[in-house]
Each structure stands twice: as structure tokens, then as C-alpha cells.
């Protein structure tokens, strides 16, 4: 297999967290292009299926106008049981999410989709991480909501910020819950790219 260079890779996301995580393992995509797609879950769609569909849809949307590139699409979903917790639209919804997660285990699904040029191959990996929050006091809930860290976060949770202090334990991948499973992403990309590890 001929090794590609990273300027042939597009990241279908403008997430600063994901860009920083990729840089952590010395990966800098040639282009960063966010994908504007419909993120409404399908009726009775399960969280894992939704995460896979979103990652794939983001990659496909960007590759449709950039067919000669590899495209990396990523999606992170917070789920309580079968309920998908999307990005909170307002503080009222963020409060509902935080109260729902308080004292309970929940799952974070992060799917990574790599499309090769012209969609000749498609690789998808999904990482599931179990997280348990402490039971939150009213003061903690109000403090977190006032911080506005819930904005633009799946389930209203910013694990790199204040929400991190609510975590009693997690089982799985920490990098995955903040937006990108590093091990799985590295393994996918190393099949095609010269990652300059030496």
C-alpha cells in the first residue's frame, strides 16, 4: 500500500477539541471543513446507530465535493439508556440533561468514519465509554449551568471542564468522551498515512 501524506486528509469537523487531540498524536489534516448535516435522530434510532450514521454522513457530505481526498468524520453521542442527548439548545434543556445524568451511569458513543478517495473503502470504528456522575446538589447544578460550559456539548457535558469534577468513574476511553478515540483513530489512519513517528 502506498503511504499517503496528511495534506490528502480532510477533517469533517471544526471542533477545537478534535483538532487538538489529533495534534496530540502529530496528525494535522490538510483541510478542516465542517459538515452541515441534519442531526435529528430517526424514530426509535439507537444511540450507537445514530453515532455511526452521523459520522458517516459528515464524511460523505464533505467528500461529495472533495472526491479525491480521504475524509475523517466523527460524532460523539451521550445516551442515558436508549435516550439520545443532543447538544442542549438552551439552558432549560441543559438543566434537564444534567438532572437526568445526576447520580446515574450513562454511555458516550464516539464513532469515527474514514472514507478513502471516491469512497472506494469505508472504515468505521465506534468506542463506547461508560461514565457515572455523582449525585449533584442544587448548588452544583446552578453553578455548572451558570458557567455556560454546556453550550455546544453533547448532553450538555463538558468533560474537559467543570463536568469533569462530577465523574465518579469511567470505563473506556477518556479521549473518546471528549471527542476523539485516539487509539482507534491512529490505527485507522496508520493503514494509509505516513504518520512520521520517527
Curated annotation (Swiss-Prot):
Gene Ontology cellular component list: cytoplasm
Gene Ontology biological process terms from the UniProt entry: nucleotide metabolic process
Tree of life domain: Bacteria
One Pfam family here: Maf
Keywords: Cytoplasm, Hydrolase, Nucleotide metabolism
InterPro entries linked to this entry: ITPase-like_fam, Maf-like
GO molecular function, one term: UTP diphosphatase activity
Catalytic activity: dTTP + H2O = dTMP + diphosphate + H(+); UTP + H2O = UMP + diphosphate + H(+)
Top-level enzyme category: hydrolase
Site (Important for substrate specificity): 17, 76, 160
Active site: 75
EC numbers on record: 3.6.1.9
Subcellular location: Cytoplasm
Cofactor: a divalent metal cation
Similarity field: Belongs to the Maf family. YhdE subfamily.
HAMAP family (UniProt xref): Maf
Protein function: Nucleoside triphosphate pyrophosphatase that hydrolyzes dTTP and UTP. May have a dual role in cell division arrest and in preventing the incorporation of modified nucleotides into cellular nucleic acids.
Protein name: dTTP/UTP pyrophosphatase
Native species: Wolbachia sp. subsp. Brugia malayi (strain TRS)
Amino acid at each position: 500500500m502506498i503511504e499517503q501524506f496528511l495534506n490528502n486528509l480532510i477533517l469533517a469537523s471544526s471542533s477545537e477539541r478534535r483538532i487538538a487531540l489529533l495534534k496530540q498524536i502529530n496528525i494535522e489534516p490538510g483541510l478542516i471543513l465542517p459538515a452541515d448535516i441534519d442531526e435529528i435522530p430517526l424514530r426509535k434510532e439507537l444511540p450507537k446507530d445514530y453515532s455511526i450514521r452521523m459520522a458517516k454522513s459528515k464524511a460523505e457530505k464533505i467528500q461529495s465535493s472533495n472526491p479525491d481526498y480521504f475524509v475523517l468524520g466523527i460524532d460523539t453521542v451521550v445516551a442515558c439508556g436508549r435516550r439520545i442527548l443532543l447538544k442542549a439548545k438552551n439552558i432549560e434543556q441543559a438543566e434537564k440533561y444534567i438532572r437526568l445524568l445526576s447520580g446515574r451511569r450513562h454511555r458516550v458513543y464516539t464513532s469515527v468514519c474514514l472514507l478513502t478517495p471516491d469512497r472506494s473503502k469505508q472504515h468505521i470504528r465506534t468506542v463506547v465509554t461508560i461514565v457515572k456522575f455523582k449525585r449533584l446538589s442544587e448548588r452544583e447544578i446552578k453553578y455548572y449551568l451558570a458557567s455556560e460550559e454546556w453550550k455546544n456539548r453533547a448532553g450538555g457535558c463538558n468533560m474537559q471542564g467543570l463536568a469533569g469534577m462530577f465523574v465518579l468513574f469511567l470505563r473506556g476511553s477518556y479521549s473518546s468522551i471528549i471527542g476523539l478515540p485516539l487509539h482507534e483513530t491512529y490505527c485507522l489512519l496508520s493503514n494509509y498515512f505516513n504518520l512520521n513517528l520517527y
